[in-house]
Amino acid sequence: MSNVPAELKYSKEHEWLRKEADGTYTVGITEHAQELLGDMVFVDLPEVGATVSAGDDCAVAESVKAASDIYAPVSGEIVEVNDALSDSPELVNSEPYAGGWIFKIKASDESELESLLDATAYEALLEDE
């Protein structure tokens, strides 16, 4: 079973979301998602300043197996991207919940968080796959 940190929120598309002290949210893909994709070779990051809606594809993770869209779990403005992934996309594999984060977003509608899964619900989703 993949590591599913209890303090994070999850989307059904295997993104995770963590609230930061400054009120922004950090987004990445789950350990389960990176295991399915395999070794990352490139991450196409969103543009800082871009406005996205929940469910929009806003980044792409390319691995040796496939390219997979990464979706915005909430609506808002992209305020930061993980530039380290340009040189080290493998961080998504080795540190999916730490150094392998993809982008940070300033949520425009925090009520959208209610539609995300907690760790228990995400683990149940994984068991059904």
From Swiss-Prot:
<dbReference type="GO" id="GO:0005960">
    <property type="term" value="C:glycine cleavage complex"/>
</dbReference>
<dbReference type="Pfam" id="PF01597">
    <property type="entry name" value="GCV_H"/>
</dbReference>
<dbReference type="InterPro" id="IPR002930">
    <property type="entry name" value="GCV_H"/>
</dbReference>
<feature type="domain" description="Lipoyl-binding">
    <location>
        <begin position="24"/>
        <end position="106"/>
    </location>
</feature>
<dbReference type="InterPro" id="IPR003016">
    <property type="entry name" value="2-oxoA_DH_lipoyl-BS"/>
</dbReference>
<dbReference type="InterPro" id="IPR011053">
    <property type="entry name" value="Single_hybrid_motif"/>
</dbReference>
<comment type="subunit">
    <text>The glycine cleavage system is composed of four proteins: P, T, L and H.</text>
</comment>
<dbReference type="InterPro" id="IPR017453">
    <property type="entry name" value="GCV_H_sub"/>
</dbReference>
<feature type="modified residue" description="N6-lipoyllysine">
    <location>
        <position position="65"/>
    </location>
</feature>
<dbReference type="GO" id="GO:0019464">
    <property type="term" value="P:glycine decarboxylation via glycine cleavage system"/>
</dbReference>
<dbReference type="InterPro" id="IPR000089">
    <property type="entry name" value="Biotin_lipoyl"/>
</dbReference>
<protein>
    <recommendedName>
        <fullName>Glycine cleavage system H protein</fullName>
    </recommendedName>
</protein>
<dbReference type="InterPro" id="IPR033753">
    <property type="entry name" value="GCV_H/Fam206"/>
</dbReference>
<comment type="similarity">
    <text>Belongs to the GcvH family.</text>
</comment>
<keyword id="KW-0450">Lipoyl</keyword>
<dbReference type="GO" id="GO:0005829">
    <property type="term" value="C:cytosol"/>
</dbReference>
<comment type="function">
    <text>The glycine cleavage system catalyzes the degradation of glycine. The H protein shuttles the methylamine group of glycine from the P protein to the T protein.</text>
</comment>
